[in-house]
């Protein structure tokens, strides 16, 4: 596994203020049936990921963990082609009934949308 394919701590949003910065003033948002993504340019020089998978949407821990693993893996594989933005991925109710392949496909659509956005300020 090359360095670009890893998912280190620096590629994650960990603090509340990092999440709030993206969610309160996103540069853009997009969504599909399963996920919603808010994004904002960062100064880190790399894309970073934050997850919002609430118990209110997925009641069972095993469901929440499965969805989080899928989101992280999809981001890890695609992060080399993404702009230097902070991404917060939230889930929608339909995610509970979807299989893994469907979720990966839905995330790929969202990452493709992110790659197609113009990078501001550079």
Swiss-Prot record:
Which keywords annotate this record?
Answer: Endonuclease, Hydrolase, Nuclease, RNA-binding, tRNA processing
Pfam families named among the record's database cross-references: Ribonuclease_P (PF00825)
Primary role? RNaseP catalyzes the removal of the 5'-leader sequence from pre-tRNA to produce the mature 5'-terminus. It can also cleave other RNA substrates such as 4.5S RNA. The protein component plays an auxiliary but essential role in vivo by binding to the 5'-leader sequence and broadening the substrate specificity of the ribozyme.
Disulphide-bonded residues: none
Primary enzyme class: hydrolase
Q: Which gene encodes it?
A: rnpA
User: Where, if anywhere, are coiled coils annotated?
Assistant: none
**EC number(s) stated in the UniProt entry for this protein:** 3.1.26.5
Organism of this sequence: Halorhodospira halophila (strain DSM 244 / SL1) (Ectothiorhodospira halophila (strain DSM 244 / SL1))
Q: Which GO terms describe its biological process?
A: tRNA 5'-leader removal
Would you tell me the protein name for this molecule?
Answer: Ribonuclease P protein component
């Amino acid at each position: 596994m090359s360095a670009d394919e890893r998912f280190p701590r620096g590629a994650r949003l960990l603090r509340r203020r990092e999440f709030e910065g993206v969610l309160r003033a996103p540069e853009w948002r997009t969504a599909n049936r399963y996920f919603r993504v808010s994004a904002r340019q960062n100064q880190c020089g790399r894309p970073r990921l934050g997850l919002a998978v609430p118990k209110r949407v997925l009641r069972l821990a095993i469901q929440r963990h499965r969805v989080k693993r899928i989101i992280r893996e999809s981001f890890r594989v695609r992060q080399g082609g993404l702009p230097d933005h902070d991404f917060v991925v939230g889930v929608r109710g339909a995610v509970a009934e979807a299989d893994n392949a469907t979720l990966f496909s839905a995330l790929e659509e969202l990452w493709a949308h992110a790659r197609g956005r113009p990078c501001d300020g550079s």
